[in-house]
Amino acid sequence: MKKTFSAFLALLIIVSTAVTASERADVDPKILSAFQKEFSFATNAKWEVKGNLTQVNFLLNDQGVIAWYNSDAELVTTARNILYNQLPISVIRTLEKEYAGADFSGITEVNRNNETYYQIRADEKSKKYLLKASPSGNIIVLKKIK
């Protein structure tokens, strides 16, 4: 029984290593190096090449993050889900004023080109919006969902 379990465990380790290696097989080594420098404490990295961009989903301090790199191994964008109470106070004040009574969900903090903004889904009684908010509280409607 112990030999069977040991053999199974060894096979599992080999398969896991092969899967990890194959997940990185298509990723440019420059991008892997840039990622390891930028996010040295990241865990559970999952890679996907999408056209000219390479996307990596990973955990950083137990929080899910997505990052995109261009073909020059430059970090283009990062995104992570956050809670309503993690929004800047100026954004919360504007949301409470302009969308009083709405439910907010799907809140994502995005960093792109040295700019931070927040994408927020606002559900009112009969309307749904995808909003974009700047840290200063300026909000625009990106899309009316219903």
Residue ranges, per PLM feature:
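Bacterial Sec-dependent N-terminal signal peptides
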Residues: 1-25, 35
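Interaction-mediating elements
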Residues: 22-146
